[in-house]
């Protein structure tokens, strides 16, 4: 699959700033950095520049975003998380000339604040920064000291703002005024890897400017009330001031007047997915790399089986070595559903069985995968469609994100001593009681607080249920008296059938389905036990109550 994606142009090898886990000694995707720490080791992540393989998920950013509106069977929370992660922004690009003849390009969603720019900030890996490192030891030391933290936008925005002032200056694209140039630890290597600092109207820039005594120039005011920028930035749109020919215009109108100084642009927060990992247990990357030129590569699909199994090969006096890196763990899980559907195929990646079974009707997974597996799977599905391997462009029609079983208000963990052993519970109460309580205690999408008292209650109810279904007398034909008495139960039974069917098939609300069954059982007064019912009605009753209690049904038929 990777080789096919490579041939399609969806795989690139690039030098990029990555999240490096110093304990696991491997690269982590932004999605795998939690609060600045590695998702497996818990170690503080540092920024590092390496040569790695990446999948061009950015090419699908627009479709990944727009098609979320059509995923009606997905929880809105998951769809919104993906919208935020993809992060589409409309704005403008501006170019700043510099005293060193370099050109610094920036993207901004607030072009109306262009006259409030008082500094430019470059990322640690900006081309100008890299060039200056070679001759500036202080800058090099500063970068080494400030390379900790994730490469994600959220982590950078929360980090302590630190900067290094460069001797070079930039020139404002409209006024030609001199502007300071800084290297900032909060600037990401996304887009151009540079930003225009407008401290009066951006809180991150404001904090940075306050710390380093950089000028704060207000260029937008609220038309209805006085703005005080002595304590914080004014980030809302309003009326333009202190901006020459833009004065008096509304923010939107001012942006439209700047077309001759910049160009409209669309930007996405979503970055290409770096998939190279430095783990010995991962799936191998099927590529050979030129020993003297890392950009000269050969996919295994271009080699015979003998050559691809060698650690080193010689082609036209060029030495190629097998890539020592392995795939990110999410690569295989991003398309396994398609391969499992065509597991009998030995000569093709996927066969017609994949089209027969996909998309998956009902997918179940934790919400923690919203911007990981669930997003990557959507990308892979679209790519496989473009490769003519699949007919569908979306992998999962319906998605259920199940909650977590908690004990004492927290996730079960051996270190916390709050682990519940299901085998012991099944041995004492039976699998039906454990299953019933798990489904009844909370909606499937919410976390469940485990309670042995609740489990005991489920056990008692099942005993009552068992006895009740076998106490009811059966008869082929009812007399008039029995029919009249039974009519009330018949109405309640039909209502319950309708409710439980809807809860299971459409709403996926298992707890309310079980609650309906409980209401039905509690509804049956003693007089019904003295009344004969038809075998058909008793069968319906038994079927509906054994939907959630499968082993009760098994006992009946054994």
Where are these regions (language model features)?
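N-terminal catalytic cores of NTP/NDP-binding nucleotidyl/phosphoryl-transfer enzymes
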Residues: 1-2, 108-109, 113, 174-205, ...
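Residue patterns forming the tRNA-binding/recognition surfaces of aminoacyl-tRNA synthetases
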Residues: 1-106, 111, 194-293, 421-454, ...
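Flexible, glycine/threonine-enriched loop-and-boundary segments that flank and lead into catalytic domains
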Residues: 78-83, 87-105, 150-173, 305-327, ...
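Long, charged, mostly alpha-helical binding arms that flank functional sites
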Residues: 88-93, 99, 221-224, 228-268, ...
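Catalytic alpha/beta core of large soluble enzyme barrels
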Residues: 126-222
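Active-site-adjacent "gating/activation" loops or surface patches in catalytic cores
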Residues: 173-183, 325-363
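Gly/Pro-rich turn-and-neighbor structural signature
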Residues: 267-320, 331
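Conserved small/polar residues in nucleotide/adenosyl-binding loops
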Residues: 550-557
